[in-house]
Amino acid sequence: LWNFFFETGFVYPKKYDFMARERASYRRLYEKLYGENTHISRHIIYQENGKVYGHAAMLRTYEKTWMIHHHAAISQKKKAGLVVMDQLGRHTGDYHTLESSMMDYIICYFRPENRFPNRVFGDVAKNVGNQKQCSIDTFAYFHTERKVLVDNLVSPWSLELATFTELAELKDYYEQKSGGLFVQAL
């Protein structure tokens, strides 16, 4: 699977450099998520004759929210990405109806300049046409190490748990700006 991530460009040099610092931790995490029966992860691998052509995974990131991540496919195998997404759709369609699935929301982070996820997820949101059923929000992201981030904050900045009042303010602000589902999914 690691070779597949490199072959598809899912793990690109800058991402690998960032991950390499914690290589042993990443390896243990992947062994646990892919090798053990866990209630917080699911993965789908499309392969033929032992060769991986497509992959997608889900991780339960919040109490009743699952995140689709690590979607990748080899371009030489036509429609491998669609095959994996179709299977993931079938899985979530069946699975979310079970109370034990803890699946009220599905989220996915993707860069809008990536054509495939933008067409799949963006088109779904457009076709649904209701922010209270399916929403897309633009966020920024960056790589950082938690220890570096926390240790280098200067006054008056601090990183603390949000208060009830702050969460209410976030909800009100988000509702005005987006009207989507993100805060509910948290």
Locate each region found by the language model.
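Extended, low-complexity, amphipathic alpha-helical coiled-coil/linker regions that act as scaffolds
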Residues: 77-78, 130-142, 171, 177, ...
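Generic hydrophobic, helix-prone segments enriched in Leu/Val/Ile
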Residues: 1-6, 116-125, 142, 174
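A conserved beta-strand-loop-helix scaffold within acyl/acetyltransferase catalytic domains
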Residues: 2-73, 171, 175-186
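Short, well-ordered alpha-helical scaffold segments within catalytic/effector domains
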Residues: 23-27, 82-85, 167
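Compact beta-rich and alpha/beta scaffold cores in large eukaryotic transport/transcription complexes
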Residues: 95-96, 105-108, 157-162, 167-183
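Conserved N-terminal entry element of GNAT/NAT acetyltransferase domains
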Residues: 1-9, 144-164
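Acyl-donor binding region in acyl/amide transferases
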Residues: 40, 48-54, 59-135
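Extended low-complexity acidic/polar segments
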Residues: 123-155
